[in-house]
Curated annotation (Swiss-Prot):
The gene is MRPL33. Residues 1-8 form a transit peptide. One of its GO terms (cellular component) is mitochondrial large ribosomal subunit. Its main location: mitochondrion. It comes from Homo sapiens (Human). Belongs to the bacterial ribosomal protein bL33 family. This is Large ribosomal subunit protein bL33m. The keyword Isomerase does not apply. Component of the mitochondrial large ribosomal subunit (mt-LSU). Mature mammalian 55S mitochondrial ribosomes consist of a small (28S) and a large (39S) subunit. The 28S small subunit contains a 12S ribosomal RNA (12S mt-rRNA) and 30 different proteins. The 39S large subunit contains a 16S rRNA (16S mt-rRNA), a copy of mitochondrial valine transfer RNA (mt-tRNA(Val)), which plays an integral structural role, and 52 different proteins. Disulfide bonds: none annotated. InterPro entries: Mitoribosomal_protein_bL33, Ribosomal_bL33, Ribosomal_bL33_sf, Ribosomal_zn-bd. PANTHER family: 39S RIBOSOMAL PROTEIN L33, MITOCHONDRIAL (PTHR47037), LARGE RIBOSOMAL SUBUNIT PROTEIN BL33M (PTHR47037:SF1). Keywords: Mitochondrion, Ribonucleoprotein, Ribosomal protein, Transit peptide. One of its GO terms (biological process) is mitochondrial translation. It is found in: Mitochondrion.
């Protein structure tokens, strides 16, 4: 019997790419990577719309890295 790549399970990646959205309500967002096993990110980052540092929260997973 010949084994092909179809029969082997894929391993999950260690990091994922996530979208961070501003809590100031400006709609500004950026992408960053985080460890898969870590909880959802919340961080202070510069928002150019309001020209100050505001809270950003993780809204959705974009892809595996």
């Amino acid at each position: 019997m010949f084994l092909s790549a179809v029969f082997f399970a894929k391993s999950k990646s260690k990091n994922i790419l996530v979208r961070m959205v501003s809590e100031a309500g400006t709609g500004f967002c950026f992408n960053t990577k985080r460890n898969r096993l870590r909880e959802k990110l919340t961080l202070l980052h510069y928002d150019p719309v309001v020209k100050q540092r505001v809270l950003f929260v993780e809204k959705k997973k974009i892809r595996s890295l």
